[in-house]
Amino acid sequence: MSLRTRPPFRADHVGSLLRPPRLLAARDDFAAGRITAADLRAVEDEEIAGAIKMQEDAGLQSATDGEFRRASWHMDFIYALGGVSKAPGNMAVKFRNAAGEIEFTPASIRIDGKIRIEDTIFADAFTFLKSHVTTAVPKLTIPSPNMVHYRGGPAMLDPAVYPDMEQFWADLAAAYADEVQRLGALGCTYLQFDDTSLAYLNDPAQRAEIAGRGEDAERLHLRYISQINAAIKDRPAAMAITTHLCRGNFRSSWVASGGYDFVAEALFSELAVDGFFLEYDDERSGGFEPLRFVPAGKMVVLGLVTTKRPELESAADLRRRVEQAARYVPLDQLALSGQCGFSSTVEGNALTRDEQRAKLRLIVDTARDIWGD
């Protein structure tokens, strides 16, 4: 099979990378007032340049900035939206792992103004990335519009600003459409919408939580699909857009479980993206049967390599699982990646940077073995 020249690529990765110790120390120093914002930026720039080289040396056709300038994959973007303010207190999201539970506690949000883009979000970050890649396509990740809604729901809206939820949905889609156009003008040709909500909704416990706050949990995924479609319908012709779905990724822990069955038919047949990055590293993700709904022309990037644990997968096992997936969607529509990012938040998952590099190299080598150069 021929080498793909348009994203997503046969060997790809979700986006975030483990933060180097020097960068973590600089963030702590900045928070404590020991260094300036310019000092922190200089460290970020140097470490991002190194991360880009690492990705290109591994053989990847795309490169991100590792999300090194962010505290988390989604909240930095959401806080930067016009109309969104940090509210007193913190959200508490329970994550699970083999040892028990931990909590992710970002600042709560309040929507107290009309949702809009004031300044292009991550513009400087993308411009730096684009200017430093040499062989790879610069890839930018942003949270899906659904993430603005999922955690808080209608309760986070000021009713004086949004007495009608439909106006909120319309403004949210328009803001994202504006951001997509702005990023396109900066030269972005590979944009990814990261979305845990569409994966979480496969879990009955998550749907019960949504129903408990008075929303239609059985149809919310349809609203979310339409929100993304509205945001990307006028995307630049040169821009490939993917979405990444997972069930939570914080310090090697997760939130939800369950296959893609509940959302699969609508998700794969209606969501107008170019490709789907799907978590598939263990039994929590279910089987490949939902892939039967993937139409011709859409790529599925199988997240078979775990980013939660350090153990390196067997190339033979990865090939076998790709062959299993190919029973439901043609092999030519498949690709390979990690199951999620390596560091969705600044804390990162429980593996080393050398182990991260080995996993990226494994993805590249295995994809080359399966699909050729």
Segments the model singles out, each with a brief description of its role:
Residues 1-373:
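Domain-level signal for soluble alpha/beta catalytic cores
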